[in-house]
Amino acid sequence: MIARFVGRLGGVLACAVVAACSASQPAAPSNTGPEELNYSREMPTIATGDLAARGTVASSSDQTPFDFSELPAGSTAHTMVYRSISGITGAPAVVSGAVFTPPGDPPPGGWPVIGYAHGTVGVTPDCGPTADSRLLGDITSVAIQLNLGYAVAYTDYAGLGKPAGSSQDAAPSHAYLEPKSAAFNLIDAVRAARTVVPQLSSRWVALGSSQGGETAWAAAEYFGAYGQGTDLLGAAALVPTLDMSGLVQRAESSTLTADQTYLYPNVIEGLAAVDKSINTNDYLHGVLRDDEKTLLACLPPASAGKEALASRFNGSDAKPSSAEAADRLRDRLTSYALPQQPTKIPLLAIYGGSDQTVPPEWTEVAMGRACARGDTILRIRMEGQGHKLDPGALLGQWIADRFAGVPAVGNC
C-alpha cells in the first residue's frame, strides 16, 4: 500500500485544491530507542540554544532533482537542510526539505505560504520525497499550489531523507505517527523557507493528507507554544491519521484491511526505532517479517514486488504474540493520538465514509474529543469516498478564505 499511498496521497491533494476538480534500503533496526518510551503530550524541555536555532538553514541549493516540466513555467525551487527539534526528547534534529515559489513578482507582504505535510511514504532514509524528481508523487500537488499563487514549504520529516553532511547512520530515526516531531518539522520548514526565499510572507496555512493530515492538525495544536515568528491561519487535514490505536484490535482479530496491513510494518518499525520495549518480532510474522525489507522500502529495486505481496497476506501475520504485547502497542499508539492540546487555530477535516485505511468512525471519535476541547473544526464526511477522496472546490476555497481573513466557522 505504501507504493500505492504515494500515488494516492499525491492524487488526493492534486485533486483537492483545484476548484474545477472532478471526481534498496535495509529495514529500520529494531529496538534502537535509547529507553522505553514514556510519551508526554506536553512540550518537551528544549535547551535555549536549540530553541533559538529552530528553522536555521544549514544548507540550501537551487540545483534540485525536481521535474520542472510538472511545475508552472517560471517557478523556482530550492532544496534545504534545516534544524528542528524532536518532539520526544527535545533534542535538536536535522531535517531535509524544499521551498517552491510561484512565477512572477510576490504580492505586497510576500508570497502566502502553504506548509505542506506529505502523507505516508515509509520510515527509512530512502523515503525522503525531496530527493525524488516527482516528490514521490507530490509534484502535481505542489504545482497546483504554485498555480494558485502560493509558495510551498515542504518537509521530509526527521529520519526521512539524508540531510547533506550527515551519514545515514547519524540520521535520526523517523518516529512515524508521532505528532509533535512532525509538527515541529513542518513549522520549522516554514521558518527555513523564509530564510532561503526572503520574499515569503509570515502568513501560512498547513495542509496535509493521511500522515500529513495528522501533521497539519498537530501543527495547529502546538503552534501557540512553538510557532513564534510566523502566523498560522489554519490547518487543513485530509483523511488524517488522528488516532490509529484501533489497528491493534484489528490485528488481534486478524481483520486488518489490505491497506492497513501494508501500513502496519511502518507503524511497528517507527515505534521500535524510538522505544526499545517494542520488539518487532511480537508483531510481524509470516510475509510481514519475511518480506519486510520490500514492504518498508520506498524506491526500486528494493521496493519491487510490493504490490504483489497483497495476495500472500495472512491475517495472523500481524497478530500480536501476547495480550501484553497488544496492550503495549495500543498504549503507544493511544499516546500519539490527536487531539493532544486545544487550539485556537481553525481546522478543516475532510474524510471518506468508505476509507479502508482510517475508518471514518476512528476519525469521528477523535474529532469529537477535539470539539469537546472547544476547537473550531469544519468536519466534512465524503460518503462513498475512501482514503483517496475528491473534496472538489471546498478545500481550495477554505484555504483562500483563511488568507483573505474570512472568519472560520465550525460544525462541532
Q: Positions of the model-derived regions?
A:
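C-terminal motif of bacterial Sec signal peptides marking the signal peptidase cleavage site
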Residues: V17-A20
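C-terminal catalytic histidine-bearing segment of alpha/beta-hydrolase fold enzymes
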Residues: R330-D331, T357, E361-C412
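Accessory cap/linker subdomain of secreted extracellular hydrolases
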Residues: E35, R41-G49, L238-P339
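Short beta-strand/loop motif that positions the catalytic acidic residue
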Residues: T343, L348-D355
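Catalytic-loop region of hydrolases
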Residues: A23-P106
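Alpha/beta-hydrolase active-site loop
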Residues: A175-V196
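Short, surface-exposed "cap/lid" segments of acyl-processing enzymes
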Residues: G87-S96, F100-L148
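Primarily recognizes the serine-hydrolase "nucleophile elbow" in alpha/beta-hydrolase
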Residues: R191-D259
